[in-house]
Amino acid sequence: MGGGGNLVDGVRRWLFQRPSSSSSSSSSNNNNNNHEQPIFNSSSFSSSSNPNHSANSGELIIEEDLDFSGLTLINVPKRNHLPMDPHKKGETEFFTEYGEANRYQIQEVVGKGSYGVVASAVDSHTGERVAIKKINDVFEHVSDATRILREIKLLRLLRHPDVVEIKHIMLPPSRREFRDIYVVFELMESDLHQVIKANDDLTPEHYQFFLYQLLRGLKYVHAANVFHRDLKPKNILANADCKLKICDFGLARVSFNDAPTAIFWTDYVATRWYRAPELCGSFFSKYTPAIDIWSVGCIFAEMLLGKPLFPGKNVVHQLDLMTDFLGTPPPESISRIRNEKARRYLSSMRKKQPVPFSHKFPKADPLALRLLERLLAFDPKDRASAEDALADPYFSGLSNSEREPTTQPISKLEFDFERKKLVKDDVRELIYREILEYHPQMLEEYLRGGDQLSFMYPSGVDRFKRQFAHLEENQGKPGAAGGGRSTALHRHHASLPRERVPAPNGETAEESSDVERRAAAAVASTLESEEADNGGGYSARNLMKSASISGSKCIGVQSKTDKEDTIAEEEDNETVAELTDKVASLHNS
């Protein structure tokens, strides 16, 4: 999609999240007067209850007219389509047993990886395009299954236009023996990482619009006492109409302490380039929602620069880049750092003066830079909250509190499983209970103590399996309609619901059965040669395995530049001790 022309109805749709609408549906042109700033003719934020969801997770619907004709459409990578075999069209009919006959009309495989398969489809009830992700062997590893449970639960509870939405989860055939799950999502076209790479002509209005959506979504998430903990451009889904949605809540956590702004989790492994300074070297024993605000600041700076702001090679290099730009922190900030060796490291650092933001971003709006300074404050207590940032003068004429709702903190009972040691059967039962939230009749029977649900409400998953198997078998065949490849090779990093691991041209299902083993070996070999000097703890399995249901990394055919970016940035499993002795000394208090 080209980057020129007036923004049309699709641009308005970000504020028209009605149940039957799709932010990825095609838009039609109309003639609007051009405005440099969006104009709101009316404002109302309503909440409607969805019968498939709990009462405390009402869907937010914005009902207002927005003229954003000053924006242009953004470029997003296009897919090559793999049309269905006309002789196999009948296999698209499924879910007849549970009253869902023909609801989802499968169109094409848009993603494939060790986790399973993603197919695009059309919901015949609403007409919107959706993505259906089949996750294989959910319970192979309890840790992965727990992460999936956490994300399914959070995405059910966090119902907001700026957070990716689960539309439906398919009923498994057996309560106690199922292994795979099928999750239906709204279909998004790309992610912010790809948008930044593909568009060198973004306007100040684009930047403002993007940041507004991120902060509005984050305000809602933080009001629920949820910390995302891994915000980065690849975890922000995007459409050509400029709509953004936050995804990948697999690392998110909910705070239940009496003081919800002071939390500590020992398993935190955020992507380094977007990691707040208090997380580098375990500087703070406690951290706050300000960790997400820092990440948003880094993302906003990347939009303005067209490249990452702090592309550190390791933790120490990351700190050096931060202090080179922001200056060394003042003594009062250093004094609040609990790690003694970290305090000594920063105290002994040569005095650095901050670089004026106007020098780093000479073409940026001064109001944007003043807000960016508030987002990138070194000391977390000095960072603006999402709510405060939305009230910044930068959003004058755009921000409206009635369109920026808050919510109640999530109940502690929802995440009681986090405090228990779970086995596979425990997680399976908890995920099954979450699936029933999308099947209200069965949920009612379940809550009454019914134990024969699969006999009362038969599952359509078996038919769905055959449908996915057919798609996988025909994906990439030389004679298949569409030219043998269903995904574009240049799509290397993706968040659901887009392609992950495109199979080589001409590869059959049998030939691709060992794709994970071969790709993992190739990645391991590449990393061994390119990371020899660093001794990094980069895991090939972790690159291939997608534990997140709404966003994940992938291995694809990468250019040298993209491969180096991935290796440098995506070392999510690094521990400080794996880098250098210097960093290890910071880690050990």
UniProtKB/Swiss-Prot annotation:
Please name the catalytic residues of this protein. 230 (proton acceptor)
| Disrupted-gene phenotype | More susceptible to oxidative stress.
**Phosphothreonine carried by residues:** 266, 271
The catalysed reaction is: L-seryl-[protein] + ATP = O-phospho-L-seryl-[protein] + ADP + H(+); L-threonyl-[protein] + ATP = O-phospho-L-threonyl-[protein] + ADP + H(+)
Q: What is known to happen upon mutating residue 134 to R?
A: Abolishes CAM4-dependent activity
Q: Ranges for the Protein kinase domain?
A: 104-395
Keyword Acetylation attached: no
Activity control summary = Activated by threonine and tyrosine phosphorylation. Activated by two independent mechanisms, the binding of CAMs in a calcium-dependent manner and the phosphorylation by MAP kinase kinase MKK3. Activated in response to mechanical wounding, hydrogen peroxide and jasmonic acid (JA).
Tissue-level expression = Ubiquitous.
Motif interval(s): TXY: 266-268
Give the residue ranges for region: Disordered: 18-56, 474-589
Report biased composition (Low complexity) as residue ranges.
20-34, 41-56
Q: Which GO terms describe its molecular function?
A: ATP binding; calmodulin binding; MAP kinase activity; protein serine kinase activity
What changing residue 266 to A does, per the record, is: Do not affect CAM4-dependent activity
Residues recorded with modification Phosphotyrosine: 268
The domain of life for this entry's organism is Eukaryota
Tell me the protein family, please: Belongs to the protein kinase superfamily. CMGC Ser/Thr protein kinase family. MAP kinase subfamily.
In the record's own words, the domains note is:
The TXY motif contains the threonine and tyrosine residues whose phosphorylation activates the MAP kinases.
* Functional summary from the UniProt entry: MKK3-MPK8 and CAMs-MPK8 modules negatively regulates ROS accumulation through controlling expression of the RBOHD gene during wounding.
Please state what the protein is called: Mitogen-activated protein kinase 8
